């Protein structure tokens, strides 16, 4: 099995929230991510229909989901919701899911919007972009890693 470090893979990342879901797209070869869209999290049917359209359009090799944690690393009240969302993505779309600690991603996105380096109105997508960039930055330059393999 080949890891992403040595090959090109398209990735979609999600910053799951009870009202909105931020989405970003990235590429493992260029190790770059960009904000894509903010989906309204109206209900399960709407949520997965919207995600399905993005998956059909972008044809990702894998998905990344931000995992909310407290600053001390303990699970957040929303941690289980994000885990369930990631498991549902895996079950519905048969794509591998990796969870990334998303501590401070929204804070960083807000700071970027205030400074003008990030897009206003896209806070959740900007947070997803930060989550995905953290994942991409963590890919080993030396070759495949069991932690980041797509099956």
UniProtKB/Swiss-Prot annotation:
SMART domains: YqgFc. Coiled coil: none annotated. One of its GO terms (biological process) is rRNA 5'-end processing. It is found in: Cytoplasm. GO terms for molecular function: nuclease activity. Its main location: cytoplasm. SUPFAM superfamilies: Ribonuclease H-like (SSF53098). Gene3D superfamilies: YqgF/RNase H-like domain. GO terms for cellular component: cytosol. It is an enzyme of class 3 (hydrolase). Keywords: Cytoplasm, Hydrolase, Nuclease, Ribosome biogenesis. CDD domains: YqgF. Its EC number is 3.1.-.-. Could be a nuclease involved in processing of the 5'-end of pre-16S rRNA. Belongs to the YqgF nuclease family. This is Putative pre-16S rRNA nuclease.
